[in-house]
């Protein structure tokens, strides 16, 4: 409801013009920098491999399979198994996606990854929930 105030006519007249003061928020840009573990690179020029030394951060398991799979692929796998069925619910009017999400409602995303998630085969990761250091690493690079 608060954001409706930006469209409220009395707040967009004369010198006030509230809506004109809104600045876009951009999560990423090719001209921005990524900086982690004392390594800084341009967003559009990230070298392959492990440029940010994730292997130094992921200590509670062998980091190599997780680094090879990558943050984006792992998070897409974690979230996609809910997002895709929910989108199908919107198209079909069914509740299968919602029912799946409610099955895990007791979890936050973090606890789901740590306690209930099993990676898909194509990621070539161990068939068990994610270790804490991997979750910390994923959260650092999400967005």
UniProtKB/Swiss-Prot annotation:
EC number of the protein: 1.4.3.2
Coiled coil: none
GO molecular function term, any single one: toxin activity
Highest taxon of the lineage: Eukaryota
Entry keywords, A to Z: FAD, Flavoprotein, Oxidoreductase, Toxin
Reaction catalysis annotation: an L-alpha-amino acid + O2 + H2O = a 2-oxocarboxylate + H2O2 + NH4(+)
Needed cofactors: FAD
Keyword Flavoprotein: yes
Family per record: Belongs to the flavin monoamine oxidase family.
Note: Ascorbic acid inhibits the cytotoxic effect caused by toxophallin. The mechanisms of such inhibition could be based on inactivating the H(2)O(2) that appears as a result of the amine oxidase reaction and is toxic for cells.
Role noted for this protein: Cytotoxic L-amino acid oxidase with high oxidase activity towards DL-methionine and L-methionine, L-phenylalanine, DL-norleucine, L-isoleucine, L-arginine, L-tyrosine, and DL-leucine. Shows relatively low activity towards DL-lysine and L-lysine, DL-asparagine, DL-valine, L-histidine, DL-threonine, DL-tryptophan, and L-glutamic acid; and no activity towards L-cysteine, L-glycine, L-proline, L-oxyproline, DL-serine, and DL-aspartic acid. Does not use benzylamine, ethanolamine, diethylamine, meta- and para-phenylendiamine, ortho-, meta- and para-aminophenols, or putrescin as a substrate.
Name of the molecule in the record: Cytotoxic L-amino-acid oxidase
Annotated organism of origin: Amanita phalloides (Death cap)
